[in-house]
């Protein structure tokens, strides 16, 4: 069978829950960014130091680079999808097997040579002060093929999501130049829209009729799963879940925001248009009941 191409859409119902997949040991405390580069297609940051181990890994894999992907709009921009849900962006942390191979170039020739961690970016109302350290460097690499020293103290640990349960599958690097095992954290990190839009001001390596061309988007569309491709999950929630826990969380957030909007409408019109105000407060009660029932079901599923 041909190798599974990356990225993919992860269907949580079909993922195999395997609690034997232990938590990763992530040692980024000594990792230091050395340079940041606009390749004309993406932002790449080179690192020195830092490694991962544990989980299903046979030994230590050292951090080499991180790649950042985004889209034209905040609603999409990730390479991987969770139940066809696209995040605002994606960071790929590329590691290689230093114990077995002498270099990244040597490691990429082997199926156990490369491990890539995917961290999703989700636009929210608040700036991410840690991600801002990357954003602050972008002015120094506006043109394609520009590289500059990363001149800020930056701790990669601060970009890890709050929950480190993960999906994993065997695929390829995004440019399909090598086989790679993927570790995908479904819990995103939040950034502000202004932070993401800064990446769209970078210049591409291609020109359009002599005019500057911006990297407005660089994400890849997912590939169809091969018949023999298996996706595993390190937690237990997949066994009982009838819908994606990731998508359900965002649906619950949408319902909660709608409830707040209805309540604001009620407060605004209670002295004027009482009919509309009563309708609004009825919706508040209905949405509150739905959110309560969903949270109860979600709690039961986590316990099963």
Curated annotation (Swiss-Prot):
It is found in: Virion membrane. One of its GO terms (biological process) is symbiont entry into host cell. InterPro entries: CA_dom, CA_dom_sf, Carbonic_anhydrase_a-class. Apparently non-glycosylated. It comes from the Viruses. One of its GO terms (molecular function) is carbonate dehydratase activity. PROSITE patterns: ALPHA_CA_2. Residues 1-235 form the Alpha-carbonic anhydrase domain. Homodimer; disulfide-linked. This is Cell surface-binding protein OPG105. It comes from Monkeypox virus (strain Zaire-96-I-16) (MPX). The gene is OPG105.
């Amino acid at each position: 069978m041909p190798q599974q191409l990356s990225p993919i859409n992860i269907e949580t119902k079909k993922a195999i829950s395997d609690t034997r997949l232990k938590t990763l040991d992530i040692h980024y405390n000594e990792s230091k960014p050395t340079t940041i580069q606009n390749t004309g297609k993406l932002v790449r940051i080179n690192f020195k130091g830092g490694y991962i181990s544990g989980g299903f890994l046979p030994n230590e894999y050292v951090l080499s680079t991180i790649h950042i992907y985004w889209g034209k709009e905040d609603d999409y921009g990730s390479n991987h999808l969770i139940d066809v849900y696209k995040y605002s962006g994606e960071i790929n942390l590329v590691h290689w097997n230093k114990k077995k191979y002498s270099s990244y170039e040597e490691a990429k020739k082997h199926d156990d040579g490369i491990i890539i961690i995917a961290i999703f970016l989700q636009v929210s109302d608040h700036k991410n002060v840690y991600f801002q350290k990357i954003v602050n460097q972008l002015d120094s690499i506006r043109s394609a093929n520009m590289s500059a020293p990363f001149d800020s103290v930056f701790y990669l640990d601060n970009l890890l999501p709050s929950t480190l349960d993960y999906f994993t599958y065997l695929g390829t690097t995004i440019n399909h130049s090598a086989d790679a095992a993927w570790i995908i954290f479904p819990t995103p990190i939040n950034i502000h829209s202004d932070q993401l839009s800064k990446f769209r001001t970078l210049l591409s390596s291609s020109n359009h009729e002599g005019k500057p061309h911006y990297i407005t988007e660089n994400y890849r569309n997912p590939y169809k799963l091969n018949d023999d491709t298996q996706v595993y999950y390190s937690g237990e929630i997949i066994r009982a879940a009838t819908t994606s826990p990731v998508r359900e969380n965002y649906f619950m957030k949408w319902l909660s925001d709608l409830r707040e909007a209805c309540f604001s409408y009620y407060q605004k019109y209670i002295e004027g248009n009482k009919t509309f105000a009563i309708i609004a407060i009825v919706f508040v009660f209905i949405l509150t009941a739905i959110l309560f029932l969903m949270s109860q079901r979600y709690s039961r599923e986590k316990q099963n």
